[in-house]
Amino acid sequence: MQKPSGLKPPGRGGKHSSPVGRPSIGSASSSVVASASGSKEGSPLHKQASGPSSAGATTTVSEKPGPKAAEVGDDFLGDFVVGERVWVNGVKPGVVQYLGETQFAPGQWAGVVLDDPVGKNDGAVGGLRYFECPALQGIFTRPSKLTRQPAAEGSGSDGHSVESLTAQNLSLHSGTATPPLTGRVIPLRESVLNSSVKTGNESGSNLSDSGSVKRGDKDLHLGDRVLVGGTKTGVVRYVGETDFAKGEWCGVELDEPLGKNDGAVAGTRYFQCPPKFGLFAPIHKVIRIGFPSTSPAKAKKTKRMAMGVSALTHSPSSSSISSVSSVASSVGGRPSRSGLLTETSSRYARKISGTTALQEALKEKQQHIEQLLAERDLERAEVAKATSHICEVEKEIALLKAQHEQYVAEAEEKLQRARLLVENVRKEKVDLSNQLEEERRKVEDLQFRVEEESITKGDLETQTQLEHARIGELEQSLLLEKAQAERLLRELADNRLTTVAEKSRVLQLEEELSLRRGEIEELQHCLLQSGPPPADHPEAAETLRLRERLLSASKEHQRDSTLLQDKYEHMLKTYQTEVDKLRAANEKYAQEVADLKAKVQQATTENMGLMDNWKSKLDSLASDHQKSLEDLKATLNSGPGAQQKEIGELKALVEGIKMEHQLELGNLQAKHDLETAMHGKEKEGLRQKLQEAQEELAGLQQHWRAQLEEQAAAPAELQEAQDQCRDAQLRVQELEGLDVEYRGQAQAIEFLKEQISLAEKKMLDYEMLQRAEAQSRQEAERLREKLLVAENRLQAVESLCSAQHSHVIESNDLSEEKIRMKETVEGLQDKLNKRDKEVAALTSQMDMLRAQVSALENKCKSGEKKIDSLLKEKRRLEAELEAVSRKTHDASGQLVHISQELLRKERSLNELRVLLLEANRHSPGPERDLSREVHKAEWRIKEQKLKDDIRGLREKLTGLDKEKSLSEQKRYSLIDPASAPELLRLQHQLVSTEGCLRDALDQAQQVERLVEALRGCSDRTQTISNSGSANGIHQPDKAHKQEDKH
């Protein structure tokens, strides 16, 4: 008894549908579907059975534009415009503000202003601004990651399958008679055949050539067409080990000049190709390319299958099922392609010539007719047998119907469970993909932060170099100031010695001055008693002329001294301004040192914050990976024993990774503790140094206070010397204060050097952290690979749970995996290009910095040369100043000698005066006259000697005036702010010598007056003595001769 659709009962229909013998899983499912098609069209089993064919067709159509989309790449701007509303990765809304190329990475980029502050910048990257926006709202991304609509749940392959199922259900509900039934059954049978062919003989499938990377890697041969890095195609020219790196490498000759060599690396040639066409890559990064038209046998099989399907479409409705079974029997053991291969082979089949198509159709019809005749004979035998068992069959029909209904209910229940299981697995897959995307975003953020830290590291290095240069300049200035302070201290000691000598000289001069004043008073008293000399006397005129000359010389000297004092005051003011400038520079250097301390402290705090941030990120990554692995474990708990074993391996791997992370964290914590201990020791050492410096400063202050007290207790007679000493002490105190400040600055500079060295150590630790982060990133990539493997295995579980949906899901997963792999490869290529650009920029910056350092070194050398020349000039001027001071000392010695001569003359004059008074008292009249004559002659001789002495003194005075003028001229030309105390001392000495000269001239004038008075007395006494005896005259003459002899 046949069904209304022409099918036989389920018990025997499958026996003739496959002549291969034991049916495969695909054939069994086809028999079930064939038996189920006889039921109602709206039953759930019929919907589920007819769904995959339409889903497979839909997937084949949807997969056609995939390669075109992959060829576009991330650099394709599309039709986006500035100001357009977009979504980044489907989740972050914003507005496009920039489209085009950038300097931080090659290719096309899109700058987007996000609605929320979840970005990375404010429109500027690497110091170059591309657009304006608030902070943390700007982001740069590839145009391929922009969409005009937000991403929705359940998109992708699931949506395609659901839409195909819905369309198939609608077509089933709206179908009519046998021709629509034929249109429904043929695609179903074709998909079942494809599934059975794939499960029976996987080696003939095209998916096995390009879907499994690991199998393709092992089958690489010379001459194969391959894909390198997801973007570069070429031909294999070398496979094996190399000298430049360990492991298996593949040498590829590219189609375009995008390579790096000509087949030779480091002097060793592996193959021959044009320059820039050769490329070496690890084997796991090379994918062999397979095309459907490369194998003639496969093409022939495809043509046969296409002819069979076209013949089925033209066969009558009554024999459609048997023709499907005949096609299955002829193709059951042959490999077939699904999806794109079936559609491509059907297109090729249409282009076959008419004669060949008709011959093959005729052969297929003959085989069909023979098979139908055999089936008719078998059916007749079965009907004969069935007539004898009609009663038994009628009794069993009700039981079979009940069993069939029960089987249908159980099948629907199982199918519902399978659907729920597939839905849960899909949801978990979406969650895992979201977690993976989130991890990728985190890794991108970390990479961007690492790049920013590298930029800030370069800025810090340049800043440290500048600070080192400043520290060197400060040290040089400190050395110069120390040398100047030592020289001033030596000058102060010399000044003290000179002040002691001057003090003794002043005491001697005061004693001599007191003696001379007494003698002058006596002489004045005698002159007043003797009366004034006549006005027409030549000696009086000479004395007046000498007095006028002396007054003019004193006025001229006063004028010169005022000019010299003005110049000295001017030089003192300039020196004071220079001291103020030095103080201002010192304060500036102190401020710079404080700023450097603050910067170093800030850098240390930032480094500590970065270390804590890296630790927290590593902990979060470890926890996220643990969660993802636990989720995978929960999803795969219901799998077979092999999957449980793999989950255990994954768990052991995760435990090993956790142990590695814990060890890294322990190492980082130990480093941190060690650094804190070192910081504490450095702080204690700096505190001790500061305390020692404070104690030394207190001792210096006490020492200088004691010296000031001693100098304040000096007598009032040395007021000028005290003023000079006080000025010198003030200057020395200022210099010592500057010395103390410079010592503090030197200590601060040492502290800054230590801090800079610590910062460099911390930068090295930071680089080690970066390396650890890179290792953790590699571990994350390994975990992602494991995750991808787990996803593939999950897909295998899905295929086991639902064999009907396995091909569609697997093809979708493969296409998504290909796209994902291409995106990751392109992202890695972009990152590599970005790193290359960053390396080039850093090298250019290093060259610029080296040029600046060389220029600064040249400037420093020229400055040192200038300083040496100035020091030589200064030494020469100091030598000339010392020579002038020696000459002044010699002049002062001559003055002392002159004063001694004057004293000797005055003493001889006093002796003569005493002798004259005694002679006047004791001698009587004529003898007194004779003695007076004798004394008159003696006085004339002594007067002549005194005139000669006065003339010699005048000549010496003129010579001293000339020397004084010359020394003043030299002093005007060689004056220096550092020799100000010596200049003051010489000025005071010059004034004192001028006073001594004035006193000597006054004494000479008084002596001349006294001589004139004695001459007048002798003239008056000459008139009194008119006569005298010859003996008396002869005796005085003899006495005079004897005196002359003596």
UniProtKB/Swiss-Prot annotation:
List the biased-composition ranges (Basic and acidic residues).
1035-1046
Protein's cellular compartments: Cytoplasm; Cytoplasm, Cytoskeleton
What ranges does the record list as Low complexity composition bias? Answer: 26-39, 315-339
A single GO BP term for this record reads: cytoplasmic microtubule organization
Any idea which residues bear Phosphoserine here?
S50, S203, S208, S212, S315, S923, S973, S979
**Keyword Cell membrane on entry:** no
- The residues covered by the CAP-Gly domain are 100-142, 240-282
UniProt keyword Phosphoprotein present: yes
According to the record, the residues making up region (Disordered) are: 1-72, 196-216, 314-340, 1021-1046
PROSITE patterns, A to Z: CAP_GLY_1, CAP_GLY_2
Comp. bias regions, Polar residues: 50-62, 196-211, 1021-1032
Chief location: cytoplasm
Entry GO MF terms: microtubule binding; microtubule plus-end binding
Database matches in InterPro entries: CAP-Gly_dom_sf (IPR036859), CAP-Gly_domain (IPR000938)
Which keywords accompany this UniProt record? Coiled coil, Cytoplasm, Cytoskeleton, Microtubule, Phosphoprotein, Repeat
Gene Ontology cellular-component terms for this entry are: cell cortex; cytoplasmic microtubule; dendrite; dendritic microtubule; lamellar body; microtubule cytoskeleton; microtubule plus-end; nucleus
Job of this protein: Seems to link microtubules to dendritic lamellar body (DLB), a membranous organelle predominantly present in bulbous dendritic appendages of neurons linked by dendrodendritic gap junctions. May operate in the control of brain-specific organelle translocations.
This chain belongs to the protein called CAP-Gly domain-containing linker protein 2
Give the source species: Rattus norvegicus
Q: What is the lineage of its organism?
A: Eukaryota, Metazoa, Chordata, Craniata, Vertebrata
